Amino acid sequence: MALTSFLPAPTQLSQDQLEAEEKARSQRSRQTSLVSSRREPPPYGYRKGWIPRLLEDFGDGGAFPEIHVAQYPLDMGRKKKMSNALAIQVDSEGKIKYDAIARQGQSKDKVIYSKYTDLVPKEVMNADDPDLQRPDEEAIKEITEKTRVALEKSVSQKVAAAMPVRAADKLAPAQYIRYTPSQQGVAFNSGAKQRVIRMVEMQKDPMEPPRFKINKKIPRGPPSPPAPVMHSPSRKVTVKEQQEWKIPPCISNWKNAKGYTIPLDKRLAADGRGLQTVHINENFAKLAEALYIADRKAREAVEMRAQVERKMAQKEKEKHEEKLREMAQKARERRAGIKTHVEKEDGEARERDEIRHDRRKERQHDRNLSRAAPDKRSKLQRNENRDISEVIALGVPNPRTSNEVQYDQRLFNQSKGMDSGFAGGEDEIYNVYDQAWRGGKDMAQSIYRPSKNLDKDMYGDDLEARIKTNRFVPDKEFSGSDRRQRGREGPVQFEEDPFGLDKFLEEAKQHGGSKRPSDSSRPKEHEHEGKKRRKE
């Protein structure tokens, strides 16, 4: 069995199979067709109302002049449709040049590598080939100089073209040419056998526009290739993802023009404090550990102190019970009449025990002094045999407290002030103060009054004369005016308006600035007769 029997049928046919199938179909249609369907135009004289529209309507001829309709035989004169399809090009070997697709929209001088041979390195058959040798120093310098000159020329031309005003180009130097005419003789060339011609470049107008178009339109290059799709196929977005994609609005800590109510959690989220990583110093752990250790030691010390206090209380209790037991024993013996002969011996033994106890305390004190710090030891030794009178601080009141309330006796038995009872109980009389403050002196004499010698250094000795000088007084007064009279006495005196100024102002206000008052204001003259003007 062949291998093709196990393979599935192809979904697409190759080019050869398509051509063979098309050829077979055409043969079958040629065999089955009985009548040829050839379309020809109607004969002359029967073309009324007939309009040629297809290429078959024209037959083998051209247009029909008697039919006044736009006609395009063989599609001549018809506008061709614009297409971006490229024409197939072949190389010298007859192979299709597929690099035309890559060259579309690029300049003709651009090098495009589109073949496999462009990727394969060339094999060097002869290492001594002069084309593969490095150039010498002279060739490098020559090429460098040519390149520099060409670049300078190009740059200078571009800079000069960009400037709004430029100078005329420098003319080339004059050339001298020796000319020998072909016709020799006295009748030709003024009898001269040779001539020297001086050729000079014609001066060019710098403002003349260019005569020829040297720019070549290049088709637009292809766009950038599309970005590759490298994500998974689309799936339905979940509610959680939608909530995660919600972008919170911009929340400002200073402005809220709309007056929205913003929750605190949203404001803190907008503040960005939760995004910052909190770095805790290791000293916090050390402090917590130290506090824990100090607390534990304090608890242990309190517990130990409580145990010592309990033991001391137990010893005191036992000692008290022993003392009570001895007292009870002595009382029983005294009632029984038994005399104790050891009382004297007990008293001497007690004195010896007290002396022994005092010496033990002194030795303990000396040991504590020897173990104490130097500064504390010196302080204790200094205060050891000090007189008690030195401890008293001089100039400090005695802080002895007394339960009795002390009063100042100078405040009692006074006939004036609050203790006198407001003039013997007569509260209608306002005589709380028995005399005026500051002895009844004028306050204006002592307040805002500079001293006499304050401005003496600035104005000199004529300060009083300057003060007494009448300022703002005209040199020549009006007749009838008396400047010597003092201020007015009595109430202000008024007199009637003799010139009618009040009436004039009132009419001007009523008419709103009109040039001539109306007749309606004339009957009101009696209202202004009672007006009075203030006289100063």
UniProtKB/Swiss-Prot annotation:
Cysteine pairings via disulfide bonds: none
Region (Interaction with PPIL1) residue spans: 59-79
Subcellular location field: Nucleus
Modified sites of kind Phosphoserine: 14, 182, 190, 224, 232, 234, 446, 479, 481
Family matches, as Pfam families: SKIP_SNW
Lineage of producing organism: Eukaryota, Metazoa, Chordata, Craniata, Vertebrata
Protein known as: SNW domain-containing protein 1
Organism per entry: Pongo abelii
GO molecular function, one term: SMAD binding
Entry GO CC: nuclear matrix; nucleus; U2-type catalytic step 2 spliceosome
Region (Disordered): 1-46, 209-234, 311-386, 469-536
